[in-house]
């Protein structure tokens, strides 16, 4: 297990209240040994004008999961901030909930690199994202 902080799904979801995570109804669903998963609806809050999941919403989901995963790998008063994120949008989604799955690529003492893949309800890859964070 890579997590240094002990936390429940309920506590993770409570952290999103009153901010963008809560507004977009991003829900943390699973904490694995080295994965963190969350879902987000494809609805009026997250669609672009042509009825498809907005690429920016996918990036919000990816950075939200990756940043929380990064925080869970720190100790004490350490904080995590995003340095760089990229995303390749490979399939659109029109409805339902998308699922983001976050895994570490590198866990260093000063930087982390996370791979976040976002899937539609049929398990098809919609977006592949990589987030680099700094530990402060």
Swiss-Prot record:
Keywords: Hydrolase, Menaquinone biosynthesis. It comes from the Bacteria. Disruption phenotype: Deletion results in a significant decrease in menaquinone production. The keyword Hydrolase applies. Pathway: Quinol/quinone metabolism; 1,4-dihydroxy-2-naphthoate biosynthesis; 1,4-dihydroxy-2-naphthoate from chorismate: step 7/7; Quinol/quinone metabolism; menaquinone biosynthesis. Changing residue 64 to A: Almost no change in catalytic efficiency toward benzoyl-CoA. Changing residue 48 to N: 51-fold decrease in catalytic efficiency toward benzoyl-CoA. CDD domains: PaaI_thioesterase. GO terms for molecular function: 1,4-dihydroxy-2-naphthoyl-CoA thioesterase activity; acyl-CoA hydrolase activity; hydrolase activity. Changing residue 109 to A: Almost no change in catalytic efficiency toward benzoyl-CoA. InterPro entries: HotDog_dom_sf, MenI, PAAI_dom, Thioestr_dom. GO terms for biological process: menaquinone biosynthetic process. Changing residue 54 to F: Almost loss of activity with benzoyl-CoA as substrate. It is an enzyme of class 3 (hydrolase). Homotetramer. Dimer of dimers. This is 1,4-dihydroxy-2-naphthoyl-CoA hydrolase. The active site is at 63 (nucleophile or proton acceptor). It catalyses: 1,4-dihydroxy-2-naphthoyl-CoA + H2O = 1,4-dihydroxy-2-naphthoate + CoA + H(+). Changing residue 67 to A: Almost no change in catalytic efficiency toward benzoyl-CoA.
């Amino acid at each position: 297990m890579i997590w240094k902080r002990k936390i429940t799904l309920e506590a993770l979801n409570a952290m999103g209240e009153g901010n963008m995570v809560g507004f977009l109804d991003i829900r943390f669903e699973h904490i694995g040994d080295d994965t963190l998963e969350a879902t987000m609806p494809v609805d009026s809050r997250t669609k672009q004008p042509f009825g498809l999941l907005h690429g920016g919403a996918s990036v919000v989901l990816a950075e939200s999961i990756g940043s929380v995963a990064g925080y869970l790998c720190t100790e004490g008063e350490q904080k995590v901030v995003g340095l760089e994120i990229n995303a390749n949008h490979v399939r659109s989604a029109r409805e339902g909930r998308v699922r983001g799955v976050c895994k570490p690529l590198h866990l260093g003492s000063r930087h982390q690199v996370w791979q976040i893949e976002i899937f539609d309800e049929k398990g098809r890859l919609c977006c592949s994202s990589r987030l680099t964070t700094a530990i402060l």
